[in-house]
Every structure is written in C-alpha cells, then in structure tokens.
Design a protein with these regions (language model features):
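A short acidic, Gly/Pro-enriched loop at the edge of an enzyme's catalytic core
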Residues: 133-142, 147
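A short glycine-rich, Lys/Arg-flanked "PGG" loop and its adjoining helix->strand segment in the class I
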Residues: 162-176
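Class I SAM-dependent methyltransferase "Motif I" SAM/SAH-binding loop
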Residues: 77-81
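Conserved SAM/SAH-binding beta-strand->alpha-helix loop
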Residues: 102
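S-adenosyl-L-methionine
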Residues: 112-137
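Conserved SAM-binding loop
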Residues: 109
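SAM/dcSAM-binding transferase cores
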Residues: 1-65, 208-285
C-alpha cells in the first residue's frame, strides 16, 4: 500500500465522522449525529457518549418524534462521498451517511465534511453486504446509488447493486415508502434495473435515459461525482431511476431474471470497457 493511502487510512481513524465496521449501531444513528453536532471530542461508539464526560442520550431516550422527523439517507458505494457531502449542504436538517470499503476514497469526503463543518454527514467503511448490521428496521429513508461498477459481465450480475439480492438487503432497513435512486452512465445497468423493477412488480416512480435533457431536473440530480466526470461508459448520457422496494422479492423469480437479462444489450462504449478490463486482468495474471 502506498504511503499516501497509509496516511489517509490513519487519518480516518481519528475522524469522528468516520466509523469502520461499526458494532451495535442499529437504531442509534440519531444519537450518533447528536453527539457529532455537540463538538469535536472523541465519540465512544459503544455507549454513544463523549469521552470528556458529556452525556449523549441513548436512542431510546431521544424524543421519538424528533428522531422520526430527521430523515436518514445513505449513499452506497460512495467513493469520495460527493453525494453525501452535496446533499448534506443542501439539507442541513437531514442526516447523510456514505458507505464504501475503500478508506482512502472515504477520506476525501470526510475531510471536506470536517473542513466545512457539516455535522450532518458521516461515513462508514464497510462492504455494502454488511449494511443490514448497522441499521435498524425502517431506520433509513432514502438510498442513493451513484455511478456504481455496472458489473458488465453477465456472470457478475449478482454483484450489481440493484440486483434483487441487494434489494432484499436494503429492504431490511429502508422504510416502506423509502426511495432508491440510481444514477448511472451505464445503459446496461439502467436497463437491468428496469427489468428487475418490472419482473418483481416494484413501484417505479421515475425514469429517464437522458437526465440532463429533462425539464425541471431535481436539484439533487445536479450533484456530480468524480466518476461521472470520467464518463467511463462513453455513453454521453446519464440515466436515472427512482423506485420503491414496496413488496417482497420472491426468490423463485431470480432464475427467471437470470435468463431474461441475457437479452439486455451492451452499447459500444461498454463493450470497449469490458474488453479493456479483460486485457488488464490478463496482464495482471
């Protein structure tokens, strides 16, 4: 690991707004943000108290109406956390958490949040697969998935963050009317997600295959990430979907999905990307 990465990993261990694989946090995020807003002292996560002796109430003692009125939004596979930070600036009365495994990327967003005094923005270093360990049932209001790896190979479709395997995971902590947002430059991931929504009869709120050509764009969609700027898919279009996971996703349909997604085509840019990835993997071998 390079020296710069080591420095960033060491830094986030000292940041109050970054938790790494946190334990015993289900239902306690309102208390955590309350502690974060009280000052810069080290937060003792195990008891949700501040080490200088100041008391921060457990989630059970927080006014339930206040807790319920503070929406909690996750940015999954957040990378540098542009969305968590951007949304935190837009909505200072709400709470935002970016989740990613790569600490050197999280460092960027966490550093900006600290510098700008955004006490409503935090980060969790973890695999997405573990998120149900960190949030209680119906604790999360919205999920943003922005420019994730589209996992172009058919054999890796289960790794796509809108695959039913992941939607079942999100359903464990997302509110019944909670919204999932997907923003991507990958036509394949966009069409795959629409296929999932259709097959499992989920509630589609909004879709567009050319976001910036739309009238009256949601200001939240104007936040741009580092990966959007790269335009890896070379599609020249940004695709966007809003939907609810408003019903159970039968496992029996997974096999049907497995067969139907074979017919979803890739555009030229995605084919080039897949060829480049294959060449890189071969070189590494």
């Amino acid at each position: 690991m390079g020296q710069k990465k080591l420095i960033k990993f060491a830094a986030i261990k000292e940041y109050n707004n970054v938790l790494e694989f946190p334990q015993d946090m289900q239902g306690k995020w309102a208390a955590f943000f309350d502690a974060l807003k009280k000052g810069t002292s080290t937060i003792d996560i195990s008891s949700l108290s501040i080490s200088d002796g100041q008391f921060v109430p457990n989630v059970s003692s927080i006014n339930k109406e206040d807790n319920a009125s503070t929406p909690l939004t996750l940015e999954l596979a957040c990378g540098r956390g542009e969305y968590a930070v951007g949304l935190g600036r837009m909505f200072p009365e709400q709470h935002f958490i970016g989740i990613d495994l790569k600490g050197n990327r999280i460092w960027k967003g966490a550093s900006i949040a600290n510098k700008d005094g955004l006490k409503n923005v935090a980060f969790v270093r973890s695999q997405i697969e573990l998120t149900s360990n960190y949030f209680a049932k119906k604790e999360v209001d919205e999920i943003w998935i922005t420019f994730p790896d589209p996992q172009l190979r058919w054999s890796k479709s289960k790794k796509r963050l809108t695959h039913p395997k992941f939607l079942r995971l999100y359903q464990q902590f997302l509110k019944n009317d909670g919204i999932v947002h997907l923003k991507t430059d990958s036509p394949l991931l966009y069409n795959f997600t629409l296929k999932v929504i259709e097959l499992y009869d989920l509630h589609l709120i909004y879709k567009t295959d050319n976001l910036y050509a739309e009238q009256n764009i949601d200001p939240r969609c104007l936040i741009k990430t580092y990966y959007e700027g790269l335009d890896i898919a070379q599609s020249n279009k940004i695709h966007y979907i809003q939907f609810n996971i408003d019903r159970d996703l039968p496992l029996a349909l997974d096999e049907i999905l497995k067969e139907t997604i074979k017919d979803i085509p890739m555009d030229a840019g995605e084919l080039l990307r897949m060829e480049a990835e294959a060449a890189r993997a071969k070189k590494e071998d």
